[in-house]
């Protein structure tokens, strides 16, 4: 593990850029960027277009390591190059810590939750991540209803996989998303917090994780988790809120920082000039940084 990157993730001021839309969500991400499905004819062309978009983001002067601590990549992005270097090396050289999304998507809903599908190639994927100088990983589950068994299952699965990731020398981001429209969102979050605390308490002193959570209904609910000795950082997802709304809610939560995807890229368009693109990205970065660093 890179100690300098660990220090940056633990104590740095800023947020994490989530650039990890994968196969299923790519057409939607491209469409929002202004690239329609008639502009590519197969998956390779689609992934090249999305890589072009991500290259434009990470090479922009607005994508500054003074504001952006880390970036989460999709497997395809890890294997591609930016300006002649593998993406993770390009980011690390720029001062941004690289993470890799490792999950294979969500299983069918059961007990009010969606567990992760089995990650059959996890071992070889983590070996490749190490070769590519990736610092950590990210994997997402989804909680839709107040169901204690379901929430317990989500957290147990996350920690089980997290321990395999830690054994390979990487720092896992555990992401049990709570749907922002869930009827009993505040109650779900209390149960989730208790289960996460149990999981964290089961780790050895040298087993470090990060958490990526939905912004809680009750401000500072997760402060205790952020202060847990095994937690490097707690980051939050935008989860369907607009950037303005997500930033506003984030400001009420001390010690939590953003890890936004859609809320970061929502004003970026393929046909913008370099100046327009850099300004739109810069405005987004500035506001998300502010919500991550300057609290109410």
From Swiss-Prot:
TM stretches of this protein: none
Pathway, per record: Carbohydrate degradation; glycolysis; D-glyceraldehyde 3-phosphate and glycerone phosphate from D-glucose: step 4/4
InterPro entries for this protein: Aldolase_TIM, FBA_I, FBA_I_Gram+-type
Pfam families attached to this UniProt entry: Glycolytic (PF00274)
Keyword NADP recorded: no
One Gene Ontology term of the molecular function aspect: fructose-bisphosphate aldolase activity
Homology family: Belongs to the class I fructose-bisphosphate aldolase family.
HAMAP family the UniProt entry points to: FBP_aldolase_1
The name this protein goes by in its record: Fructose-bisphosphate aldolase class 1
Originating organism: Staphylococcus aureus (strain Mu50 / ATCC 700699)
Native organism taxonomy: Bacteria, Bacillati, Bacillota, Bacilli, Bacillales
């Amino acid at each position: 593990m890179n100690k300098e990157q660990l220090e940056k993730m633990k104590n740095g001021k800023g947020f994490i850029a989530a650039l990890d839309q994968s196969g299923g969500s790519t057409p939607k991400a491209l469409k929002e960027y202004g690239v329609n499905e008639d502009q590519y004819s197969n998956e390779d062309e689609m992934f090249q277009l999305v890589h072009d978009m991500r290259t434009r983001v990470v090479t922009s002067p607005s994508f500054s390591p003074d504001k952006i601590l880390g970036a989460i990549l999709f497997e395809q992005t890890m294997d591609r190059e930016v300006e002649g270097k593998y993406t993770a090396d390009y980011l690390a050289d720029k001062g941004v810590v690289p993470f890799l999304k490792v999950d294979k998507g969500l299983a069918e809903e059961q007990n009010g939750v969606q567990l992760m599908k089995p990650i059959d190639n996890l071992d070889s994927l983590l070996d490749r991540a190490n070769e590519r100088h990736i610092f950590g990983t990210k994997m997402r589950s989804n909680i839709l209803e107040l169901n204690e068994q379901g929430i317990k299952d989500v957290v147990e699965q996350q920690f089980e996989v997290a321990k395999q990731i830690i054994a390979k020398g990487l720092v896992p981001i555990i992401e049990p998303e709570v749907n922002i429209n869930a009827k009993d969102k505040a109650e779900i979050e209390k149960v989730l917090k208790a289960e996460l605390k149990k999981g964290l308490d089961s780790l050895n002193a040298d087993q470090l994780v990060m958490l990526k959570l939905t912004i809680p209904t009750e401000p500072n609910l997760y402060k205790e988790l952020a202060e847990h000795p095994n937690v490097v950082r707690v980051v939050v997802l935008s989860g369907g809120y607009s950037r303005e709304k997500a930033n506003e809610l984030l400001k009420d939560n001390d010690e939590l920082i953003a890890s936004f995807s859609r809320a970061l890229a929502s004003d970026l368009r393929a046909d913008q000039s370099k100046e327009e693109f850099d300004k739109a990205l810069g405005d987004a970065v500035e506001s998300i940084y502010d919500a991550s660093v300057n609290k109410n």
